[in-house]
Amino acid sequence: MAAAGSAAVSGAGTPVAGPTGRDLFAEGLLEFLRPAVQQLDSHVHAVRESQVELREQIDNLATELCRINEDQKVALDLDPYVKKLLNARRRVVLVNNILQNAQERLRRLNHSVAKETARRRAMLDSGVYPPGSPSK
């Protein structure tokens, strides 16, 4: 009798398709994590959109402060506040870039997992594992 977690072998010595314990566990884990990954991805997308909006608002406010500063007859020094706004904008852009990179890595990982899952399903459906397959 074949050990648990290994593929069965036909009388001709060729491996017969059958989900191994490892494959079943991997598939279950993927299905379990998929909603969380999708939710995380949608939240990251929403945060990125709000950061773009925040960056635009900071730009508008900085422009308006510069305009007010130029139009004032009284010497009102708004430059430190404009600099603080621009520094905040720079930080928002930095965080947005970090989020964008993380989201792209997550997207590539998700694509890679989906591709591997499809490959394994195709192997299971075909009924034969290639020689030297780690799923044997």
Curated annotation (Swiss-Prot):
Residues covered by region (Interaction with TOR1A): 83-136
Modification Phosphoserine, positions: S10, S50, S126, S133
Effect of S50A: Inhibition of phosphorylation
Residue ranges that the Swiss-Prot or TrEMBL entry lists as coiled coil: 37-126
Post-translational modification: Phosphorylated by PKD, phosphorylation controls SNAPIN protein stability. Phosphorylated by CSNK1D/CK1.
GO biological process, one term: neuron projection development
Superkingdom of origin organism: Eukaryota
Record GO terms (molecular function): SNARE binding
List of residues that carry Phosphothreonine: T14
Primary location recorded for the protein, binned into one broad class: membrane
GO cellular component: acrosomal vesicle; axon cytoplasm; BLOC-1 complex; BORC complex; cytoplasmic side of lysosomal membrane; cytoplasmic vesicle; cytosol; Golgi membrane
Residues modified as Phosphotyrosine: Y129
Subcellular location: Membrane; Cytoplasm, Cytosol; Cytoplasm, Perinuclear region; Golgi apparatus membrane
Protein name, entry field: SNARE-associated protein Snapin
Lineage, opening ranks: Eukaryota, Metazoa, Chordata, Craniata, Vertebrata
Gene: Snapin
